[in-house]
Amino acid sequence: FHKAKVNGDRSVEVWGNGTPLREFLYVDDLARACMELLLNYDDSAAINIGSGQEISIKNLALLISEVVNFRGEIIFNTEHPNGTPRKLLDNGRISKIGWIPQVNLADGIALTYDWFLAHYKNGGTP
């Protein structure tokens, strides 16, 4: 989306039809979860760390487009696969010890894009 915006492209292509659901977690939330587990979890059972929120690829593309300020068209290319219909972790164990993510998806994307702009001035070249 950034490259398309900078290049003045009229559209961005996204593979599939946009219906698959995905879960995302901001990196600082992952770091906080790891610290919480190091300090407060001594069980041997595996534990998932996730946001517990899912979003369709279509809505994710719209959100990224908004954050990047890309005003072109998003084209969903159904000649390419959708992938797995749904990916959402069970956060039950980590929730029981009181951890919850602090950064929502929209804020996480905005923070990540701001970081990208600060570190990659030439659209991907450090």
Residue spans for each PLM region:
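C-terminal substrate-binding subdomain of Rossmann-fold SDR/epimerase-dehydratase oxidoreductases
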Residues: 1-126
